[in-house]
């Protein structure tokens, strides 16, 4: 049976001498792997459409085994993501996160839209690190690790402002409860508001978000600690971003 779907390439791995197994993320069927025969050949008609991050239309044959790619046409190749090392690193981070936290053949319609929007935002010059943090936050409910950001995670008070973020309590703590977690991250009210924005923001309405480098480092550390505790995924792209940072490859990401 032939099936045609719009999809985003999450990853592509070599298979044999000339073939690739391509993981597509589709709106209708979720994540699925297809065999692209001859895709490793330089003149292959599949060479361009099986590159990571490509958004395209794919026709594949679904038999009893691994689906076989019959045709592909790129809708958007996101050229900036292919040639800018920083943008590419964060795009890889986001696609790897989606790959790790989704199961095959389980569609999540809004996640397809989120991923496509995130790649477009990075490609057009939005702050790639902030887009990555937004996706970090939005993936938490899908991972079964939704944080409590609307009240104190301990006493449930909605009237006292948050003064800390607790990994142990999975959310904000108020001034009456901060002593209950000595490892909680102290935060300011503006930081708490930013944290909420990253969680609730509509990606279609993300404009130019200006965040200081120090604040971004703190966001990354808090979210990574939370992920390590409740989600437990290890991302190769995260390690690559850390290496880039150490080598000064993220030096364009300065305080604004």
Curated annotation (Swiss-Prot):
**GO annotation, cellular component aspect:** bacterial nucleoid
List, in alphabetical order, the GO biological process terms annotated in this UniProt record: DNA recombination; double-strand break repair
The UniProt keyword set, sorted, is: DNA damage, DNA recombination, DNA repair
Residues forming coiled coils = none
Q: Which residues form the signal peptide?
A: none
Q: Which InterPro entries match?
A: ARFGAP/RecO, DNA_rep/recomb_RecO_N, NA-bd_OB-fold, RecO, RecO_C
HAMAP family membership: RecO
Q: Which family does it belong to?
A: Belongs to the RecO family.
The UniProt function text for this chain reads: Involved in DNA repair and RecF pathway recombination.
For this protein, the record's PANTHER family field holds: DNA REPAIR PROTEIN RECO (PTHR33991:SF1)
Its protein name is DNA repair protein RecO
Which gene is the coding source of this polypeptide chain?
A: recO
